Amino acid sequence: MFQDNPLLAQLKQQIRENIPKKEGVIRASDRGFGFLEVDEKTSYFVPPPYMKKVMHGDRVSALIRTEKEKEVAEPDALLEQSVTRFVARVKMFRDRLNVVADHPLIKDAIKARVKKGLDEKEFKEGDWVVATLKRHALVDGNFSAEITQTIASQEDHNVPWWVVLARHNLAQVEPADLPEWKVIEEEELPRTDLTATPFFTIDGAKTKDMDDALAIRKLDNGWELLVAIADPTAYVAEGSELDKEAAQRAFTVYMPGRNVPMIPRTLSDELCSLKEGEERNTLCARLLIAEDGLLLEETEFFAARISSHARLTYDDVSDWAEHGKQLDIDAGVLAQLPLMKAMTEARIAWRTEHALVFPDRPDYDFELGENGEVLAIHVEPRRIANRMVEESMIAANICAGRVLGKQVGYGIFNVHTGFDEESLDGAIDLLKSAEAPFEKEEIASLSGFCALRRWIDNLDTRWLDGKIRRFQSYALMSAEPGAHYGLGLDAYATWTSPIRKYGDMVNHRLLKAVIAGKTPGERPSLELTEHLTACRRLHRMVERDIGDWLYVRYLKADAGTDKVFNAEIIDVMRAGLKLRLRENGAVVFMPARHILDNKDRLECNWDNGRVYLDKTEVVYELGQIIEVKLTEAVEETRSLIAKPAVELVPGPAPVAPTSEADATPADEAPKAE
């Protein structure tokens, strides 16, 4: 009777049109329901049945209905699909191929088929794959996917590395080698013979791609520092297929226990690596540094042939400097180490007063077994040898920034603008509330930003440091010279890591043109600088994601025990705290309910960066060091969950006043004026 009734269809359409609609982003939960997030302050509940039609992150238009006296959102139209290409695990259901996305908030199995060229019979339960979403339930009535790539079987020991690289669409291996390598520029760029100069390298004990060597001598009023940098552009022609591949990769990918080079290993680890006792082509800079640490303007760039006279390690040099350890090395190199130490201390002192010095944070080194298992995590503090190399490289990059800025006018510059324009008002409001002696125009300038950072670094608490960083901009790559507020410098152009950074290869070619007196190559495109910026962030995510996986495996045995860790609060969110364990660098999450299972009394306030008890008492804040215990280590989501080592036991909740008379004691009653 009602089938194909046009009047009924028209009535339904009219009813639908009269239902209010909202656009927003779907935020899933781990309990089946979700929310439609319209803006920062507005969200609507999405019941589990409606969540079956969408995925976390989808942008949708939804009908806002009232069900059981509560407003709920029913997704109605897909505006932007959040998932297209994704990493998943194979799930067999009644002998049919399904995939489950490797995402903590996307848990439902999706029907799947394989792309042409793959054999469905080869896939088994738990295999890791890359898939593409082909059908969306809100559009097509159901979800379906196509498996496009095999990553690894569940038994593969390399799963953390291969899965993370595949997720970010990065190569697992280095570029293909060439049958023969030839220097392409010998006649055009004469090289000074410095093979007799006692250059030396300082690197990690396991480092193979050594790209910088140093030599120093004392002058009457300071030091002369020679910085020799490996020269892969002597072998890689601009515009060649290998050059294009290096540009696409942008950086060597560094991960716990391994790396994927930007250029073939024959170059990075052999022909260009500045190995002890082997002659190498290099690009060099001669720097002059005054006794007080001032880096003088006079800088000479030139091509040279060098031979490293000693391969030193950070630990050996630091042990020599800090504990008097004897070093059995070339006498010419040994005589330079006191000079390096003195120059480094002078440069640190100068930059601390006139620029900015990054706070010393330790590195964390994963010691892995043959099958990729984590045997130990070693804390490696930044010691004097690390600072020797760091200060030398920073000085060399400052000089490159000067030369490229003045003589070329472009290059690949690292720029950092301090605060984004739209963040300045928020930053100054925060500083005023903290009684900081700064004005808006002041902190927008390079000198004012440096003064602010130095003032904050001298505070007893790290709370303001954690808060103000939320307003700071990200560092970018730019073809134009520009200030780097984070370092407190007018210009900064890196050229000291061309084996592992494509931007440094670009700067090498421009510096070589200056040396040869030739017209420099073309200005780097906006497309290239944006690509380099994006890849730098991506590679940090890769290192973090693999680290998170390995941390969960390593710390699983400590979860649920009474082992206590020191942890720094690095973020305060509405749901809880994010902390970094100081013993090993792992990032853990402490849910608010683990602090106090009473959401009426406990508030985790992101805006203030603090956790409050009963609205007033500060329990925790950004930058605070607290003791925690691990409760869970969940490999499926690569998450570590913690709780306070000492349980918070608050006093009785304050009693709310029952009347205005109760709220104002007699002795505090307002006086008549």
From Swiss-Prot:
This molecule's function is given as: Involved in mRNA degradation. Hydrolyzes single-stranded polyribonucleotides processively in the 3' to 5' direction.
* The family this protein is said to belong to: Belongs to the RNR ribonuclease family. RNase II subfamily.
- Residues in S1 motif domain copies: 562-645
Top class in the EC scheme = hydrolase
One GO biological-process annotation of the entry reads:
mRNA catabolic process
Q: Which UniProt keywords are present, listed alphabetically?
A: Cytoplasm, Exonuclease, Hydrolase, Nuclease, RNA-binding
Tagged with keyword Cytoplasm: yes
Which residue numbers delimit the RNB domain?
Answer: 191-516
Q: Which residues form the signal peptide?
A: none
The GO terms describing molecular function are: exoribonuclease II activity; RNA binding
User: Which SUPFAM superfamilies is this protein grouped with?
Assistant: Nucleic acid-binding proteins
Stretch list, region Disordered: 650-673
Cite the Pfam families for this sequence.
CSD2 (PF17876), OB_RNB (PF08206), RNB (PF00773)
What reaction does this catalyse?
Answer: Exonucleolytic cleavage in the 3'- to 5'-direction to yield nucleoside 5'-phosphates
Q: What is this protein called?
A: Exoribonuclease 2
Q: Which residues form a coiled coil?
A: none
EC number, UniProt record = 3.1.13.1
Q: Name one GO cellular component term.
A: cytosol
